[in-house]
Amino acid sequence: MSALWSAWGADAFTEQVEKATSEMLPVGSEDIALNLEICDQVRAKQVPAKQAMQVLKRRLSHKNPNVVLLALGLTDICIKNGGDHFLQQVASREFMDNLLSVLRNPAGVNNDVKNKALGLIQNWSQIAQAKPAHMSYITDIYQQLKSDDQFDFPPLDPNAAAVAAALVETLTAPEWVDGDVCMRCRTAFTTFNRKHHCRNCGNVFCQQCSSHNMALSWFGIGQDVRVCDGCYARKGPPKNALKLSRSKSASSSSPSTSSSKHVPSGRGASSSSSHHRSATLGAKSKRSARQKEEDDIALAIKLSLEASAETAPQRSRPTSFATPSQPSAATLSAHKPPNGRVLEGTDADNDPDLAAAIAASLRDWAPPQPSAPFGLNDTAGPAPTSATDASQSANSHLPLPPSLDLAPQDVDNILTFSQTVQAQQAHNQRTGMVGAPLPASVQAMYEKASSARPRMARNLEEGHRRHNVLVSMHDKLTEAVHLYDRLLDAQMTRPAQAYAPHGYAQATYPAASHQGYGYGYQPSIPLHESAYAAQQAGPSSLYLQTPQSHAGPLSDYSGTPAPWLPQQQQQLQPQPQTQPPQYEQPPYQPTQQPYAPHAAQPQYARDQPPPQHSAQQQQQQQQQQQQQQQQQQQQKQQQKQQQKQQQQQHLNPQYQQYASPNPVSNHANAVYADPNQALSPTSTVANTAQYAAYDYSGATIDHASHTQANSVAHTTAPAYAQTNGAASMSSAEPLASQPPDTLSVRTQGIMGGAPSNVSTVVPADKSQVINDGKGNESISTSHLPEDASISSRNGWSAVPTPALTEGALERTATGTDVQHQRQQQSYHQQQAPVKADTSYLPLFPVAPHPDNGFGPDRNAAEATSPMASPYTNAPSSAGMWQNPAGTGVTSASANANANANANADAAATESPLIEF
């Protein structure tokens, strides 16, 4: 009854052991079939060897002598048929000390139990002599009991030792070999392409290469388990199975032996048994595949972190491929309690011991860390005093990677098999025996050569990994070298102008094409200063002024010539600026002046060119300036000659009386000559009388003032606004504020299209006529009377001051006015020119235009549009008093007198074109 209660809740293996050693069995009767089945489970590693040893140890401590006798017999059968891994557990201190305590029981021991136990210990000691690495502790117990007089051993059989050694030679399932790729098709393992181990050879394969199942009776495995394609075709154990089991048992016995000498009883062989694959006949797992996969990954990560934390200071590579896992992982897994197992043939989904073994194997075969960081981390001690000591210390800290060469024996086996197969194939071809079976020796050579395949695969993978590491390091080094070369090139090619001389900030100069001359270094003038340069001279700035009159902020700087200053002024003032021929001056030649730096004006000092370039640049600039001036003068003379030829060819004899009186002209549009000769159609000789320039020193410019760069206030012309045909000024100052003796001339379209209101002082006798009129309001807009409308398109427009009256409407002739306009034209052509007093007014030449009636296209132009007639509002460059909207420009008084006489309307149809 106690046996039933003790077996409650036990696993299947414990139940089978209790059934084989039951109290109900008669004395001397054993269930051999059940004992062999239990032995096969131990041999096939379906049950851990340590767990089987503990179950038998409990049965040996039973009070019933019959149970103890049956347990001793079952233990002897398992030792002879269980394999070397079970021998290690039986020879441990935990099992042998318990058996010794049974023999030395103070209460006494049964004689049958005592005699059978002493006989088994004597036989096991003889087996231990053949396997000293596995069963050395049994030999010690035998010698201890033999020296004691209380125990009498039976006589020793001389042949028993050889027989026992032969009986314990048992084939067992090989240890599993781990890898990242399939050892048959070389396919990498992933989350979905899982790895599978062959139970016959222990290698790792993919699903396609290990899809067969069969029973392995030579290993004591009666169930169908997974095998690879090669083992399934062989239908037998591998040829090196016994050798592998011996070598692995020998290599794994060393930690157990060492631990048996220093570890207390019961913990001797725990390090080696934790790595063995085990399974039971229990129920299948109920968890899903996804849950099992997540648990496996979590367990592997946990074990890897723990192992890396413990073995970080002394991490090193194994010296041989047959070295087992690290003892640290084995110790961790040894303390785990036994749990339920799964059937043989699954991939250890619920086996934590196997998962720990796999994690340890992965850690063993992990790629080594880079040598440089590893060596730097380890050099925490004092630095060596000499270079030799430093190299020795570095070599001692850096572990050498294992060699990738195969063992000489493996190389010999592979070459022997290859040469034998080639010779056999050549012999078959010569004799014509194609397809003849190979001899047995060739099959043995194939098995020997195949044993080196896993090691060769691992070496190949390690070689590829090292090659990839070296390639990546080479790429990084190449990239670093390229970056370093770029930095050196950038430093060598950096321009010298990037550094500011004398500690001042480097000024930014515009391109040479902006200045008109191809000099590489020319200080630029701000636009607001250049624009103000033409207005600084006062009302006489309508003509080209000499540069000496300009007193700008750049007058202090004269270190380098600036031939581009007039060109900038001409670009800002696109209207023609000409003088009479007798007053035409040569181009401005700036003189070289010594440059004296001003301490109070550092903003001009930074515009100074570098000292090493100033002297050469000045000489080059002077030479280039002289050459360019000569070229410009030649081009101007050629253009003038071409223009004169064109004018003489296309001049219609009908309009000879309106031609320019002076045939020699230095201007593209017209010439400045005597206005008296301009009114005479027969005069062809220009008067050489000297006329004063249009300059009134007392003239004022009514502009809105603003601050210039040199803190000098100047004015800006106010804008005109035309609304409903009336001219009005947007200036804040009323017209009534102007002095009574001023003449206001509207110059819209001049100075680059900017409107301007220039007030000039008029002599008293001339201004009296104006003051007697409508007052200051009439001065805002000036109109010409009918008698002053006779003008020439290529001559001069005489505008007498007394004729300035309150202007009539200026409008475009449309509709019925076209006929009246043509009549006026024919009338004016027949009239003799009227000479007026124009000694005090400026003279405005009319520029020729291809559409204003001159040239061979006059008839076509008048036929196309009457507005293109020379006596109508033809296009001009200045466009003064033009009305594009078609409405006349009138003053306030002209708007009041809307019904003017017909003569005023007729005169308004022709607007005199005045161009500066």
Swiss-Prot record:
Domain VHS: start-end pairs: 22-153
Protein name, UniProt field: Vacuolar protein sorting-associated protein 27
Location (main, coarse): membrane
Binding-site positions, Zn(2+) 2: C198, C201, C228, C231
Biased composition (Polar residues): 311-331, 385-396, 650-668, 777-795, 866-890
Organism annotation: Mycosarcoma maydis (Corn smut fungus)
Membrane topology: Peripheral membrane protein
Cellular compartments annotated: Endosome membrane
PANTHER family: HEPATOCYTE GROWTH FACTOR-REGULATED TYROSINE KINASE SUBSTRATE
Annotated domain remarks: The FYVE domain is involved in the binding to phosphatidylinositol 3-phosphate (PtdIns(3)P) which is required for the association to endosomal membranes. Both IUM domains are necessary for efficient binding to ubiquitin.
PROSITE patterns: VHS (PS50179), ZF_FYVE (PS50178)
SUPFAM superfamilies noted in UniProt: ENTH/VHS domain, FYVE/PHD zinc finger
Lineage: Eukaryota, Fungi, Dikarya, Basidiomycota, Ustilaginomycotina
Quaternary structure (record): Component of the ESCRT-0 complex composed of HSE1 and VPS27.
Domain UIM: 292-311, 349-368
Segments of skewed composition (Basic residues): 274-289
SMART domains, per the entry: FYVE, UIM, VHS
Cellular component, GO, one term: endosome membrane
